[in-house]
């Protein structure tokens, strides 16, 4: 039986590349994305067209903030791994619309953690951000550096998701890996990162 992987944010830049890599290796992937309009939705649609060429890929449009919808889809698919990359991105936009960050990044991640706990996921991987290092003056950053002073609302939500994930991992023994992405660029990248 093929390993099943559930990827949130699968139409996003990082999610697309992760999904494609696992599909190319023969895994079954269920992708979820809200297809929000933070940047041109056509770019997300074009990424999805490529993923949909794989017979082992299925996609559902939806929000991670909707736990009933999310739980229904995840339980039906029954993955052994969840890769949680969905998030409201962008530091500048977090000043204009902090509610979007609270809902997507914190509530959405809480929902992913709850579902991971309920289905006893074998491994949970969560995308975070280098912005959690905030006002840290030491350079270059290391994983062991302090992350106590975020300087944007976006960074504060990403640090909050790390804390929630650590708590869930400790309390319910959910094997969890958190990845702190720095500026990510490449083919099919976000236009605001150019």
Per-range role (PLM):
Residues 1-184:
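N-terminal Rossmann-like NAD(P)+-binding domain of SDR-like oxidoreductases, especially those catalyzing
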Residues 187-194:
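Substrate-binding strand-loop-helix patch
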């Amino acid at each position: 039986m093929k390993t099943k992987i559930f990827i949130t944010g699968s139409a996003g830049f990082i999610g697309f590349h992760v999904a494609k890599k696992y599909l190319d290796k023969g895994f079954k992937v269920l992708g979820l994305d809200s297809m929000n309009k933070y940047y041109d939705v056509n770019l997300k649609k074009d990424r999805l067209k490529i993923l949909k060429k794989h017979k082992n890929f299925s996609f559902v449009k939806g929000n991670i903030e909707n736990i009933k919808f999310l739980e229904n889809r995840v339980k039906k698919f029954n993955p052994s791994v969840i890769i949680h990359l969905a998030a409201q991105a962008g530091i500048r936009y977090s000043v204009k619309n902090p509610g979007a960050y609270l809902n997507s990044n914190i509530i959405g991640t809480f929902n992913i953690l709850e579902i991971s706990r309920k289905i006893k996921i074998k491994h949970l991987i969560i995308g975070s951000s280098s912005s959690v290092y905030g006002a840290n003056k030491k350079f270059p950053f290391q994983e062991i550096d302090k992350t106590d002073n975020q300087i944007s609302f976006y960074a504060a939500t990403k640090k909050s998701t790390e804390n929630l994930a650590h708590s869930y991992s400790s309390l319910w023994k959910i094997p969890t890996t958190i990845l702190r992405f720095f500026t990510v660029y490449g083919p099919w990248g976000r236009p605001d990162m150019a």
